[in-house]
Structures are given as C-alpha cells and as structure tokens.
UniProtKB/Swiss-Prot annotation:
Belongs to the GcvP family. N-terminal subunit subfamily. This is Probable glycine dehydrogenase (decarboxylating) subunit 1. InterPro entries: GcvPA (IPR023010), GDC-P_N (IPR049315), GDC_P (IPR020581), PyrdxlP-dep_Trfase (IPR015424), PyrdxlP-dep_Trfase_major (IPR015421), PyrdxlP-dep_Trfase_small (IPR015422). It holds the Pfam family GDC-P. Its EC number is 1.4.4.2. The gene is gcvPA. HAMAP family: GcvPA (MF_00712). One of its GO terms (biological process) is glycine decarboxylation via glycine cleavage system. Keywords: Oxidoreductase.
Length: 448
C-alpha cells in the first residue's frame, strides 16, 4: 500500500529504488544537510475541509487584497491597470493553447505557432524593428539579455545605462553582468532624463552599448535622436526599453536607429498579478538576427506548398548548442504572449492608437489638476502616462490613507532615491475616469 493518499509509491517501490542507488533510507539522501537544521516534526496542518468551506476561507483571504476592479489605481512604475478584453481569457483558456512552452512539434502545433508568429509581427511593427522573438520572461530580463547580446556582438565588456531606467531592470542587468564579468556604469539622470553631458564623458572605446528607457522610469520621453547619434558615433549599440502601448503615439525606437528594443507586453491583455508573471519582448535589426536569445517562429511552406509555421534558427539555442548558445533562456512566456496577441488583435491599429491617446490625455488632465491645486509637478510636460508629484508627507503614509478612500496611490520614488523622498510617481491609464482623477487630487490636498 502507498503511504500517502496522493503519492502512488509503495514501501516496496521505495525500498527497490534505495537499493539501486545504494542508500539505506530516505534520511541518508539528506546527509549533506546539517542535522540541526533538518525539519523532523510533523506539519501542523488543519483538518481537511469540504470544498465549499475551503472556497469560503480562500475568498476571505483574497478579500484582504486591494483589487483594481474595486479600487481606482494610480499605481504604475512598470505594472499598469489596463482594460483586458473579455475574449483574451476565453482564447488563452482553450486546451490547445494552455501552456507556457513553445511547441517543438510543428505538425501538431500550427495554431499556437501562428499565434506566436503574430505576436512577433505585431511587436516588430510597434517597435519599428526588423524582427522580434517569441517572448522573454519579462521586461527586466529582456533588457539584461539585450546587454549581453551587445557585449557579445561588439566584443566589449562595459555597458552604460541611464539613471532614468527602471531601478529593478537596472538591478537585473547588474546581476546578469556579474556572471559575465561585464562592467555596468550608471549615467546620472538630470531633470528626469538622461544627463547628456555625463553620457558624452562616459563614452569610450570599451563601451558595448547604452541603455535608455522610452518613456523612462519618471514618465519622461527621452531624446532618442540625440542619444542615437552619440552612441553610434562611438560604434556602440543603442538599447531601448520601451512601453509598447506608448508606441501607439510615439515615434518607434527603430525609426531613431535603435539596435535592440525590449520591454514588457503586460500592458496588452495581462493582469498586474502582484508584479508577474508578465511577458518580455525582444526586437532587433536584421544584422543581429542570429544572436537573438529565445525562440523564433518563422513562416514557411510544407511539401504541398501550403503555408506553415516552425521554430527557426534553432542553432542559436541552448537545447542545441548548450554552453555555446546565445542565451540560456529556456521556457518562455508563450501563454502570456498569446494573451498580448489577442489583446492587440482585438484593439486593432485604430483601437491601439485610441487607447494610447486616452492614456496621454487623462494623465495630462491629472497633471493639470495637480498644478491648479498648487502641487509641485516635476519635470517637463513631455510624458506619456506617468508624472512625478512632490508631497509634504511620506508616500507610504499618504497611500495608506488613500486606500481607506478606495484609491491605490502612486509609486513611492523615495524607495530607490533619497532625493525623491516624498515624491509620488502617478500613473493614469484609460481605466480612470474624470471623477476618479478629481477625487484622487482632492484626497491629496492635505499632503500638498
């Protein structure tokens, strides 16, 4: 008989397995773990509950969370509250799509491969690049992989990154760089954008690439044309991390001459989910095609001349080349990429532009209301859907008060930068109404 209800292994099965590997007991398998830190007690689990009782308890726990369908959220900083068309969940819940993995058998996976191909196509069009891969873990890892590509392509071991790039993405890059013995230098931010003079001084023959964010962490739109000229005159690569929704209005980075464009497609069809899982994208020019990390789906024809889709250029990948691969990324975010594909296809080009325009208009309306009420709003008016407001009280304290009023406040910039203590990064998406924006501004009057 099996010792555990849901584990089919019997005591005899266990004994035979231990005999094969020459071990007397299960405990011997953990002999490398010091005796004093091994867990030997029984788990203090509550008695089993019926399904209705369990659902009640889980619902009670879930109700402690602030749900953005019930609260007016002005929180962004990389993860945003956007409308998700109902059709998205319907499509991704279909059994033939319900996996995070890229299909290796094209004969039985044409639907999923075509959906991934469409994702690549739409991302390439949005970013103005020649091609995009099937997805990455998230925007941060996509940025780090871009830096690794730049270093490998240029044979240089130093990356410059703007201080106006999201701090979490910057930290992911630094983690990657440590293992690859790549030096990362942060170019300071000045008035919410990259300090151009500091960048000029930092550029040298050992610089593989420069990383900018567009729009950046503070919501500002970086001068990509000027950055591109400086970086390419140094024979370095220009890497741009971008919010793909903003590209419904802004000039795509590819048109400025960016070599690699990365970001997160969470803004299309993917819920906030406490910060993940989301879906990174990675787009490049043709000259870097064979150095792209992750999966690439290509269009071809079968022996009957019919259109088909396959994984292509696989010699780059770790399941083929192992330690010589362009990257060791393995499973990707195929299911979330599908969600973004469905959302983008549902919006269409006109709908995407309208969604981006609502973000722009509503955030600028909010900024104007703050100024009318006497708040100090930092930096220029050249932003997409985020801006910085200075308050007189700690942001943590302010946000706690806002939550009691049914409002999720903006991001506390002082968490990363002491000079931005008492500064709130406010995000305004198409989900917010005029009444909610007015109420938000009014609620902050006491913290002006």
């Amino acid at each position: 008989m099996a010792k555990h209800r849901y584990l089919p292994m019997t005591e005899q099965d266990e004994k035979e397995m231990l005999d094969v590997i020459g071990v007397k007991s299960i405990d011997d398998l953990f002999q490398d773990i010091p005796e004093k830190i091994r867990f030997k007690r029984d788990y203090d689990l509550k008695p089993a509950k019926s399904e209705p009782a369990l659902l009640r308890e889980l619902s009670k726990l879930a109700s402690k969370n602030a749900n953005t369908s019930e609260y007016a959220s002005f929180l962004g900083a990389g993860v945003y509250s956007h409308y998700i068309p109902t059709v998205v969940d319907h499509v991704i819940s279909r059994s033939e799509f319900y996996t995070a993995y890229t299909p290796y058998q094209p004969e039985i996976s044409q639907g999923e491969l075509q959906a991934i191909f469409e994702f690549q196509t739409m991302i390439a069009e949005l970013t103005g690049m020649d091609l995009a891969n099937s997805s990455m873990y998230d925007g941060g890892t996509a940025l780090a992989e871009a830096a690794m590509l730049a270093s490998g392509h240029t044979k240089r071991k130093k990356i410059l990154i703007s201080g106006a790039v999201h701090p979490e993405s910057s930290n992911v890059l630094k983690t990657y760089a440590t293992g690859q013995h790549i030096e990362v230098e942060v170019i300071p931010e000045l008035d919410g954008k990259t300090d151009i003079e500091a960048l000029k001084k930092a550029l040298s023959d050992d610089i593989a690439g420069f990383v900018a964010q567009y729009p950046n962490f503070y919501g500002q739109v970086e001068p990509l044309a000027e950055l591109e000229k400086l970086v390419h005159e140094n024979n370095s690569l220009l890497l741009v991390s971008s919010n793909p929704l903003s590209l419904g209005l802004l000039t795509p980075p590819g048109e400025f001459g960016a070599d690699i464009v990365v970001g997160d497609s969470q803004v299309f069809g993917i819920p906030e989910s406490f910060g993940g899982p989301h879906c990174g994208f990675f787009a490049v020019t043709n000259k870097l095609m064979r150095k792209v990390p992750g999966r690439l789906v290509g269009e071809t024809v079968d022996e009957n001349g019919k259109r088909g889709y396959v994984l292509t250029l696989q010699a780059r990948e770790q399941h083929i080349r192992r330690d010589k691969a362009t990257s060791n990324i393995c499973s990707n975010q195929a299911l979330n990429a599908l969600a973004s594909s469905v959302a983008m296809a549902t919006l269409g080009k006109t709908g995407l532009v309208e969604m981006a325009k609502q973000n722009l208009d509503k955030s600028h309306y909010a900024k104007q209301k703050f100024r009318e009420k006497g708040f100090e709003v930092l930096f220029s008016d050249g932003f997409f859907n985020e801006f910085v407001v200075k308050l007189s009280k700690p942001i943590k304290e302010v946000n706690k008060s806002l939550l009691d009023e049914g409002i999720i406040g903006g991001y506390d910039l002082g968490f990363y930068e002491e000079k931005y203590k008492h500064h709130m990064l406010v995000a305004v998406t198409e989900m917010r109404t005029k009444e909610e924006i007015d109420a938000f501004v009014a609620s902050l009057e006491g913290a002006k």
